[in-house]
Structures are given as C-alpha cells and as structure tokens.
Amino acid sequence: MNNGILHQNYNSKKFDIIKISLASPEVIRSWSHGEVKKPETINYRTFKPERDGLFCAKIFGPIKDYECLCGKYKRLKHRGVVCERCGVEVEQAKVRRERMGHIDLVCPVVHIWYLKSLPSRIGLFLDMPLKNVEKVLYFESYIVTDPGMTPLEKKQLLTDEEYAEALENYGYEFEASMGAEAIRDLLADTDIESEIELLQAECEESKSTAKKEKAIKRLRLLETFQASGNKPEWMVMTVLPVLPPDLRPLVPIEGGRFATSDLNDLYRRVINRNNRLKKLLDLNAPDIIVRNEKRMLQEAVDALLDNGRRGRAVTGSNKRPLKSLADMIKGKQGRFRQNLLGKRVDYSGRSVITVGPSLRLHECGLPKKMALELFKPFVYSKLRLGGHATTIKQAKRMVELEEAVVWDILETVINEHPVLLNRAPTLHRLGIQAFEPRLIEGKAIQLHPLVCAAFNADFDGDQMAVHVPLTVESQLEARVLMMSTNNILSPASGQPIITPTQDIVLGLYYITREKEGARGEGKLFSSYEDVSRAYNSGTIDIHAKIKLRIDRQVFDTKGNTYNEKGVVNTTVGRALLLNILPEGLSFSLLNKVLVKKEISKIINQAFRVLGGKATVVLADKLMYAGFKYSTLSGVSVGVDDMTIPDNKEAKIEEAEKEIKQITEQYQSSLITENERYNNIINIWSKTSDEVGASMMDAISKDTVSINGEKKEIESFNSVYMMAKSGARGSYNQMRQLAGMRGLMAKPDGTMIETAITANFREGLSVLQYFTSTHGARKGLADTALKTANAGYLTRRLVDVAQDLVVIEEDCGTDDGLMFSAIVEDGEVKVPLVERALGRTLAADVVTEKGVVLLEAGTLLDENLVELLDDNGIDMIKVRSPITCKTRRGLCAKCYGRDLARERQVNVGESVGVIAAQSIGEPGTQLTMRTFHTGGAASLGITVSDIKVKTAGKIKFKNIRTVTNKEGQEIVISRAGEIIVSDTMGRVREQHKIPMGAVVPLASGKAVEIGDVIATWDPHAQPLITDVAGKVVLEDVIDGITSKHTYDDLTGQQTIEITSISQRTTSKNLKPVVKIVDEKGAELKSIPLAVGAVLNVADDSILEVGDIVAKIPLEGSKNKDITGGLPRVAELFEARRPKDAAILSPCDGMVRLGNRDTKEKQRIEIIDKNGHIVEEILLPKSRHLVVFDGEQVSRGDVLADGPTDPHDLLKYKGLEEFADYILIEAQSVYRMQGVVINDKHIETIVRQMLRKAVILDEGDSKFVKDESIELVRILEENDKLRKQGKKEVEYELVLMGITRSSLSTESFLSAASFQETTRVLTEASINSQIDNLRGLKENVLIGRLIPAGTGLAVRKESAKIEKMREELGVEDNMVFTDLSSFNPEEISFDSIQSQKEDKDINEDIEESLRNALESLDF
C-alpha cells in the first residue's frame, strides 16, 4: 500500500499553500549560485561553456552527469566534490534546470511591471502621474528628493535648466537626482504609517468623489504594503536573477550555427550594458554619457522582463520581437496554458476513425500495430513472466520481430484493460470515454455508431486519440466512471444520448410501416417464432398487417408488474422486433411506426424501468436490427423521388399578379415603401409555404389498386421516408428540392424581395444562383466565427465555475426559488413537471385542501412529479445552487439529482465544470444572428386579440380597468396579466395585456376554448383617462412642439408631437394634456410622448375611459433582438444594456416636472410625508411609463427599455434576478431545440454572485462600499457574532463571468485565465496566498484535483495528517511494528490514549479503504 494513492508525488515537497511576493535583493542573492559577469555563452570551437558567462558550469552545474568540466573527476563516487581546476561541482546535469545565477546591477533599475502595468503601482505609491515618473526614470528631468531649507517642494520635477538655476541659487542645500536611484530613494523614504493616517483623514473630510476615490486607492495600496511585509523599494531592482541555463537552451543545428532562446539575447544585452556602465563609472566619464548608459540599461532590463510593454519591442535578426520572460508565461502558448494546464502524455496515439457496426457499446476496434505500441511495457513483462524471454532486451527483440507469441500475449494483456478515446474538440465530458479494445487489422480505429452523438463524430476523416490508463486506480475509474455504457444519459439534460440516428432510424421506420394489401395480410400467428419462420420462407411480406398472440410481463416505473396478454393487431416487421424487446417493456412501445422520437422514448422507458445494463443491450440490438433492415430496404435517392407539384406554376403566377398590384399602389403613393416591402415578403412566404404544402401532399401519398379498387396510402417514396422518420433531411430541404427555394436572406438578416421560384430539381438560373450565394456565404463565414466564439464562451464559463464542487450532503437551508411552468406567448413551453424533476423541495407542498402532499427535503423523481401534476399544483419552492449556504462549494441537496446518473449527486462531483460544459457545448449550434423583427421574416400576423386555448377560469393580475361610455371595460394599468387556469386550478396560460385593451369578461369568469378575453389596437398605444373633465392643452404649440399632418387619402387632419431634437428653440417645453373639473382644479395631467397623435382638442369634454392620444407603434417595433450566442454571452457577462429600463429605487409617489434642466427631465419619488427620497435625471427623449402622482413600489419600471440585470438584482431581489437570467438564457437555447437543465444555469449564476458590497462595516476591518468575496464577509460575521459585536451589513453584487474569474481568491487560477501580467503584479504586491482549493490550481501544480476520487483521498489524507500530528510522528516515518517506536525520542503522552498495540500503518490502510468505499461505486 506504500506506493498507493496516498503517496503520490513521493519526492515533491509537501506544501499546502503557495505565496507570491516581491523579492528583496538579499532573497535573489540567496537563490543564486554565483554572479554572471560576462555576456559570453559557449566557446564555439570546444562547445564548452565560458567561465562566468551565461552558461558557466561553475555557477550552474556540470553539463554531463557526475563529471566536472575539465574531466578530472568522473563517476558517482566523487559526488559533491568541487573540482579545484575548473571549480565545477560534481553533480547530476539536471541541476542546470534549477540553479539560478544573478547579475549585480551597477545602478538600480525599476521593474517595468510595477511601473507600466495599470494602474501604475509606483506612480500611485508616490502620488505622481506615470508621465512624470517616466521622465525621471528615463533621464529627462530631475526630481527633488530632499528640498532642505529651500522653497522647492519634494517630488518637484526640474528640467536641466531649472536644476542649474536652482544650484546657482541654493547651492547644495537641496538634493535632486534622476533615474531609478531617485525613485528608489523616494520609495524607501516614504513613511507608510503616517501617510496612511493622512489619507484616512482625507477620505473622511473630502467632499469631491474623485478625490475620495483616488485617496481610497492609494490608501489600499499603502495598507497592502504595510500588511504584506513587502518593502516598496523592492519594486526597484539592484540585483537581477538569471534563469537556469537549461530553461533557455542553446542548441547546435546543422551548418555550425546555433538556435538559441530569445532570453539569451536579452540577458546578453543587459550584461553588456551593465559592464559598459561599470567601466564608464570607473573612468569617471562625463555625466551625459553615464546618464545615457543608465537609460539603456533600464531599457535592456525592461525588454528582458516584458518586451514591448514600453516603447518599441526589441527585435531579433528576423524583425520578430524577442520573447521576454513575461511572454513565456502569458497567452495560449505561455507556460500556464501550454505546459501546466494541459500536457502531452505518453502511452497515447491517434488515428482516423471508421464505423464499427458489429461492435458492442463498450467496445472499440484498436489496430494491432497501435495496440502493440501502446501496451509495450505490459507485453514485455508478460513475455518475461511467461518465460518466453529472459531479459527485457530479448523481449524487445521479439516484439520488433513481431513473433506469433507476441500477438497472443497482446490479446491477454488487452483483455479487460480499458482505453480512453478522445475526439477534439472536447466540448463536454462525453468527449472522452472508456472502451474495451478489440484488436483489428488495418490502421483505423473503429468506433461504435451510437457514441458518435456524444463525441459529435462522423466518419468523413475525423481523427481520434487513444490513451492508456496505466495504474490499477486509473483503470478502475475508467471502467466505473468513464465506460461508454455508464454514460447513457447526457449530463446537460438527463436525456439518453445513445439514441439511434440516421440509418438505424431509417431501418426501424421501414420495417414498422404497414402496407395495404401486402402478402399474408390478416393472418394470425401464435408467437414470434411462427412469424419469423413464415417471413423467412417468404410466405408473408414484411409490411403485412397481421394478428399476433402475445403473453408478456410488463413493469411500470413504480415497480409494479402486470401481464400483457391477448391478440394484438400489428405488422410482420414489428413482430420481428419483438425478439429484441426485453422482458418488462410493453409491446405497445414497438407497435407503431417507429420514428426517431419514438425510438428515443423506448430507450428512455427502458432506462427508467430496467436500468442501465438492459438499456445498453437493447440499444445495441436496435442498432443491429436498424442496420440490417435499412440495408434490406434498399432505400436510396433518385431524381424521380422529388415530385414537383402540378399547381406550382399557377400559384407563382398568382403571386406575381398580387405583387404587380402592390407595386402599382406604391407607384401611385397609396402605400409606403415599408408597407410595400412587407407585403411583397408576406406574399412570397405564403406562396412558398403553399407550394411546399402541395409538394408534401404529392410526395406523401401514393395511389394503389387493391383488388381492383383504387386506394390512397402513405407513400414509400425514399426522400419522404428519410425526412418523415427523422433519419436525414427536413421538410424545409424537401421544399427546396421539389417545391420552390423561396426567399433568401441578406447577410444582415433582412430578406431579398425577389424570391427564387425554381427548385433544385429544375435547376436555378444564373440570377437565382447569384441571389442565393449572398446568404450562403454569410452562413459559412458565420460558422467559422461561431466556433471560435463558442469555444471562448465555454472557456470563460469553465474558468468561473471550475472550483465549484459538491462538498457536503446538506447545508440545511430552507431557502430556494419558486418554480412554475414557463409560459411564452400564452403557451406553456416547459411544464412544471419537467422543471421540478430531480430537484429537492425547499418547502412542504400543500394541496388546496391543506393536506401536506410532499415534505420539504424530498428529492422529486418521475413518480413524485406526476403526483404534483395529478394534484394540480402549479408552483413549488425548490432548493437551488443559487441559495445554497455551503461555503466554497455546494451541498448535494441544493443541487439535487445528478442528471447523468439518476440519483442524488455524489459528494465530490465537480458540478461547476459540468454546468459550464453543458452551457458551452451547444454553443456551436446557436446562431450568431441578431433577429430583426419588423421585417416579414419573423413578422407573422400582428396580434390584436387573445383567444383562450384551454377551458377554465380567468384571473386578473395587476389589472386596473375603467368603464367607458360604450360600457366596455378598458385596461388602464401597464403590466397587467390575465391568467387562465383549468378546472383543477393549474395555470395553463398567461397573457400580458397592454394598456388600452378592452376586456369583455370579468375576473373569475369561466371561459371555453376560443373565447376572446382581450382585444386592442395593434398599431397604436392609447393614452386613456380614468377621470372625466375638460381638456386643457399645455405647451402644445403648433410648429414648435407639435405639427399638423394632413392625410391626402382620408382628408383627416391630426396633431402630432415632435421630438426635442427637431425643435430649434424652447427645448424645455413639455407638452401635457391636463384634465380639469368645472372649477378649473386639475384632476390629472398626462404627459405626451414624442410621436403621440392627439385625439382631443382644447376645451373638449372627456368621459372616463376616453382616449386622449395615441402613440403609433410602428417606430418602436423595428429594434433588433440580440439572439443566439451573443445573447448568452451578454447574459453571463452581465453587461449593462444601452438605454436600459429605469427601475424605481424605492416605494413612494412619483412627482414629475420639478426643476427640469435643458436636456434632462427629473423624476422625484416622495414618501407619505412629502419628503423627496430619491431623484433620477433622465434625457427628455426617454419615454416615461409613469404619470405624475402615481404610486410606485421598489423595482417598478419608470422608463421603458431592456432590462439591466444589475438593477434587477438590486431593486427586485435575488429571486427575480435568477428567474430573469434562467428564462432569458433558456429561451435562446429553446429556439434551437437544445435542452439544458435549469440547475446548470443556476450554478453559473451562483458564481456570478461571489462578491458583495459592504453597506455598513460594523465592527470589522472592512471599508464601507468595498466589494469583497461573500465568503470572507460571512466568515467575518461568524467571528463577530461569537464575540457579540456588530455584524457587517452587505448586499450582493453581480459580476460578469470574466470579471468574476479574474477576481477569484486564487491568483494562480486568475493568472492562468487572462491578463496574466496584471494579476501577478497585483498578487505579488499583496503577498497573496493561494490555498489551492480549486481544481485549476491543483492541476497546475500536478496534484489530484479536490473532486471525485481526489476529494475522498484528500479528506482521508487530512485525517491521517491529523493523526500523525497527534502522535508527533514525522511525515516520512512509517513503523513496521510498534517495537521500533522509541518512546525516548517522542513525547509518549499523546499515544497513551491511542490503542497502544495498534499498528499505525493499519490505521492508514483502513482509512484508505474507507476512502475508496466512500466513493460509492
């Protein structure tokens, strides 16, 4: 057990945290093994390194193992001797990878990261602008370091002339200098403590926010220096470390030249300039020359540390910028992403894949050649153990000669040794799966067809990589966790992912179809065997309708068993499939035409009822059957399969006639350009649909004569069968093949108004072909961009969620989210049953009668969600990752079911990464399009009423109505909804009702299907009065704020309000309609928005419910809706939209029109006592949706616009915000038909809410308005609560995924994500500590990740560590028995309490055994 999992990384030093901080000159010298004095590298004749040069063996160690440079000492026995001739220590050559050197710089040099990485730390520390610091550094001006008694100020800049003048005036009473020395002196002189006190005072007193912010920034920086133990002068270097030579190698290439790492060039420049400066100083050279040399030294060091950060990058001989130290670690090719987060591994190979239709689901075909190479070590050892070879050398020889015995041994070695197959890009965890290899001839890997969907593989030349798990533990994990048979369900949605596609579907569809009058119709068979015999002998046709006697046992999901007996009507093909159907599934699943959806249902049902193993067997059998019968069917595609409908020409002529009329109307100015375009588009899409429909009619029916009479039957047309079964192709593609191609889009998404009337069978004309290239090219360009964008989104998601792991069973919260069905456009898109499946209840579910149906804490499975449905429950509270109280992780209860395993999630599951993959993986399927509404492409018919689709009752929500003079109820509220619930009280429909709609029915009335519950004018939004009175128009001045328009056609005259930008003068006028009573007292004032058309004149009398003005909706409709991938990215990045909706920050009454400025309008919100609580300034062009004097609640919309998620969270709370993100993100995916479980989106949202802003610091050390990790605040509050002090008050802050990733607690994780330089600069100044909690940090340092099996091992290791501490045992001491335990050396008290005779080793082994058991295989 000694070399088991617990002893991984045996020789790596044990460490728990990594700290990064500034290095002092002493520290750099302590790393170093000697000073590099010369720029020489190696002697080009002897190829030996020059002494004191960049590759010096004396400093860095010998070139050959255990051999000094001059050759005096060779062999291991001299180890550790220092040769007196050449000064080289006899050691292993690999010390050249770890020994560092140093360069003593003649003058100090500023580290460019702390100067140029924004915000400039040196500039901020000294409170100087970066420009000034640079002037001093690069010797352009002097800086006063000590003014003495002179009137000069400290840190004042002086030009050469001013300096000379000052010297003349004050002599040597003051000190001023230039260069890094000056900066270093200033940094060292700063008294941090007194500066902090001054700044704190300034923060409290300062009135201006800008000053305050700057002071706070400086204060933070100074405090970090104070706390971290870093000295500010260390940002200026006096000693430069030199990288070990093997990390910047110099390799000879043919032709006597050398290829070298760029770093050597950069170091050479530094050494050259340093040495030259030393000489110049020794010679007492003129100041100007020394100054120039110092500047060049500074520039050389800058280039070495971060080339190109300042000025032009230093280039090599080939005009390419040299790669500096900073470039080595950042970017995709840098150390982090190239070598640490992903490495190339041994025991792997890659090859092209081909299809393996005869494999079983857990197998893959591995070419013999490849297998032999991959399993070589295993084969060698087997050859020796079997006595075929005595030495490894002999075994090697046998393998090279490929003797017969080698192949036999390879077979035994491979037996039950799983291999991993991986297809790039690996977008989700199903991109790597384990298979048992089967040896095959040839050179291509064979892949099982059913796993293609998971790998997204096809056989058009795709390649896959094979990896061999070596250790027993890794083989165990591959078999138990990664075997393809254990990955039947997709972790994103919980639906089967091994469902048959394409040929298989076609074959199954073909044999389950029925044909009228086929041979053997109407016969009765007693069993499957009979049918099979009859079919094989050719007496019955495969499509014949027959009767079959069955007698089966069927299980349902609840575990009940019942018998299925009797004679059923079926067809021969379906009866033949009966053999495949496992015991326990009903024959009714097969007794229908099997299209793709139905086959998916069978697999799903099998998994629910019979479990994984039976499902795998069933899937395999279905696949074999599907392939067999699709081959036998002979379905193929010919030109004649595409039937062109007879009435196509007539329909097109008709359309052209209509278009002619419309063009004439346009030419005689009866309709606008926009209307003309929309009408033409409408006509073409209608025609195109009609032609398509008649084509489908023609292709889907066949006329056959049965016994002399003609009968219409479903067609056996190949193209039709492929599309119908879901094997390949779609209605849309068929329409283009045989109907008409229809309208084509331009790259911006609008439609080209000339439709393509031809189809592919007839062929396109040149013009038609040209029209269609436009959109097609856009499609190809989009696809290329989309892949990159989707990959980047996935990377950001993974990075933000990587450290989220389930770490405990239950956090004990009763918080959660309210879930109900998702309703869009009045239709239930996702029923509650689907959303609730696999979630844990946060509160009891109570029926209408008050009976507790399900208790809180119940995990809802399929049977329980049905129970919810049966009892008509339409809203439940479920626990969610967003509200989980576990710190630095999640609890299993809040997450609920592991979708791929169908039971509660295991502790240790890395749910964050799974969530990120589930959201990112379908990214490539999402469009890049922004949708234009308004164009006919998505116009449809404008909705102007609501008809009910369910019988039941209606209920009003937030609706206020008034009755007008015709006795109609008019809606005067804005965000009203009508809810339709069925007889059981379940919500079936939800409709938003616009202002001004007429509602014929009262709340609570019963409705039947098809009843109209609301009507409105679709073209204009009316402004309605709820009081009666006389009209007074204010600020409605013709020619200034309004204009008369005269309609030629109807002869009507209207008054329309003009926009502010069109007015030349009087910009502060606000057109208003006031309604007054007889005495002239104002009852109501209605502000008029831009574009409003007045319905009333001055002094006219209004009744309740009358329309004052209408706002035409034409203009507002043509906004682009961002859709697809950009929308998902926008949501997760939490971007603030342009012109977002303004929400009310508090409850109160709205007061408008007070103290408006020239460009802005002011909204005031006043409380009950008339005090102003909040003020909001808005541009006058923004249209308000509230009236003067209206009561609003916190979070109500004051001005229309897209939702800003930040405001939503702030004013409406966590739940509303979570709901918004869930529904918005899901609607994008739903449009593409992608199913993603809500919990994945919630998991990411949790990571976006990691920070909180402090409202009241209480008795803590935090600063008000500071934003800090939520975990830190909660931990601080725990401490304060224990001590009985005042706790911190905070509110959650939303951060986009990129910002959230960069502001994690772990600097390693952030640095390996983006902006490496900035992250490392900040971390080192803070002396930041990385606790190595996340997955990424552990991958970086090469440890088991703290998730899955790694978490269990980690917990056990922690236990053992604790035991060892209690026993006072050294790390590396393992006792074989207690007798060797020397009580004199170790304090014996602690062990007395332990079982004295128990062997410690046994304890360790036992805890390891527990660890493996707790993995719950």
UniProtKB/Swiss-Prot annotation:
Any one GO molecular-function label of the UniProt entry: DNA binding
UniProt keywords, alphabetically: DNA-directed RNA polymerase, Magnesium, Metal-binding, Nucleotidyltransferase, Transcription, Transferase, Zinc
Residues reported in the UniProt entry to bind Mg(2+): 458, 460, 462
Gene Ontology cellular-component terms listed: DNA-directed RNA polymerase complex
Note on cofactor: Binds 1 Mg(2+) ion per subunit. Binds 2 Zn(2+) ions per subunit.
CDD domains: RNAP_beta'_C, RNAP_beta'_N
Reaction catalyzed: RNA(n) + a ribonucleoside 5'-triphosphate = RNA(n+1) + diphosphate
Enzyme Commission code: 2.7.7.6
InterPro entries linked to this entry: DNA-dir_RpoC_beta_prime (IPR045867), DNA-dir_RpoC_beta_prime_bact (IPR012754), RNA_pol_asu (IPR000722), RNA_pol_N (IPR006592), RNA_pol_Rpb1_1 (IPR007080), RNA_pol_Rpb1_3 (IPR007066), RNA_pol_Rpb1_3_sf (IPR042102), RNA_pol_Rpb1_4 (IPR007083)
Function: DNA-dependent RNA polymerase catalyzes the transcription of DNA into RNA using the four ribonucleoside triphosphates as substrates.
Family from the record: Belongs to the RNA polymerase beta' chain family.
Protein name: DNA-directed RNA polymerase subunit beta'
Organism: Francisella tularensis subsp. holarctica (strain LVS)
Upper taxonomic lineage: Bacteria, Pseudomonadati, Pseudomonadota, Gammaproteobacteria, Thiotrichales
Gene that this polypeptide is encoded by: rpoC
